[in-house]
Amino acid sequence: WVSCKSKEGLPEDISFSVNYLGANITQVGLNFSRPAAQILGQYYQFIRLGFQGYKEVQYNSLTIAKYIHDEIAKMEPFVNYSEEVVNPLFIWYMKPEYAKNAKWTLYDLQDKLSQHGWMVPAYTLPSKLDDYVVMRVVVRQGFSRDMADMLLGDIKNAITELEKLDYPTPTRMAQEKNLPVEAKVFNHGCKAHKAAK
């Protein structure tokens, strides 16, 4: 183990920062060995399910991801970043013409969804694409069609609620002024970090 009393003792080139769930999170990872529990768990699952079982699990996840992707595309404010879904995950962003008149941002939608227990992150893309604020859905094993319908219903309800706003949200005003957006995330007792744009 290596412990540093302050950030000054830690070289910047071994830290990794990512804008995730509305906050800049910095991690430092030096791993020279890994526990074997995950490998043993995967080995057990492979023996239990076999190739066909894994194929069915992945196919189910991909089918549900495509369903959510298609339903998001039907919603007026959004456009999917990619036309196709080749993995059980995808991102979308707000249509530029819609965003011009909207009183809310995807950060506000993230906040509304988190109030219903959904962890759907809104974040900026890496440099040269950092004008895009996107949201991401990852469909994991066990995420059912019923859960997908619940998520889509909560997204629609949140949009309806956000559309009723009389005034722009703080994140919308900050975005218009090109100011950093104050994060609204719970991060286990640490102070909230500021998110880019």
What do the PLM-derived regions correspond to, one by one?
Residues 32-35, 126-131:
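Short glycine/proline-enriched loop/turn "hinge" motifs that connect secondary-structure elements
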Residues 129-197:
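PLP-dependent enzyme catalytic core of the Aspartate aminotransferase-like
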Residues 67, 71-75, 108-118, 154-165:
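Generic non-transmembrane alpha-helical segments
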Residues 1-87, 93-98:
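Active-site C-terminal subdomain of aminotransferase-like
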Residues 78-119, 139-141, 145, 182-195:
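Conserved PLP-binding catalytic core of the aspartate aminotransferase-like
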Residues 13-15, 101, 147-150:
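Short conserved micro-motifs at the rims of enzyme active sites and ligand-binding pockets
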